[in-house]
Amino acid sequence: MKFIFLAVLVLFLLWSGYQTRQHPQLKFNSLTDRIANPLDTRLRYRIAEVDPRFKLSIEQVKSISQQATQIWQDGTGQDYFVYDPNAQLAIHLIYDERQIESEQRREHLSQLASNQQHWQEKKQQLDQIEQEIMRSKQFLDLKQQQLNQQIQHYNQEQQNARQHPSSFANSDYFQQRQRDLEQNVQTLQQEINQYNQKIAQLNQQVDELNTLDQQLNASVSQYKQRFKPHLFHKGLFNGKQIFIYEFESEDDLRLTLAHEFGHALGLAHAEDAQALMYPIMKEQNAAHFRLTQADRALLQSR
């Protein structure tokens, strides 16, 4: 009986070792899981902890994690993972200074974008006002030119009347002409005053825009100083647990989980910036991600 037990144990260990070489992820399953499911090569995992400050429930994270495992299944046709509430491999969402900084950075970026939009709208308004003022100036120049011609014509008529009094017997004509010209001069002067007032208002608004531009540049400088580029781990797989420290959206979380699942499959980092296993989550299409050839090559060569 003892011999049979030892033989079974040796066979199990040999089989287990062979399985682990063929499917490295199995070493992260518990011994009881492997005994209970000797032919199941999937990696079992569970959601152990979700800090409430992430504003996600465990069920929501579970759903997102299953979407992350689906990335691997869709890209390879193989089912590598299964959710098991009693699994040894546990996922923890840890809210610390990394997520705080990420949220503050996004808030600052949102405010900067809003300020830039406000500056752009104000500049467009001033550009329109400037164009209107330019059209007004052209109109006033033409009107002043026409008025000068009328005055010259009036002066010429007066000169002719003095030289030929008999031809201009009606003195009321010149009086009416003079009143009309004086009225036109007064009207033109009012329009010029209004034009100058618009110029002054425009200059004041340009000064305000320049001040806003300086404030915007200062905000950008403060942002760059406050949030200097540096590399930190969004997630970490330590062989027993997966820790998620930072994500910007559910899409980002799904991709980060899929990346850490890749490490659990025994994969190192890829050099393709669009690959799932690239060490920085930036160039990937988070919303509609598909495994790249670099990811599949890592899987085949593990």
Annotate the PLM regions.
Residues 1-302:
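Zinc-dependent metalloendopeptidases
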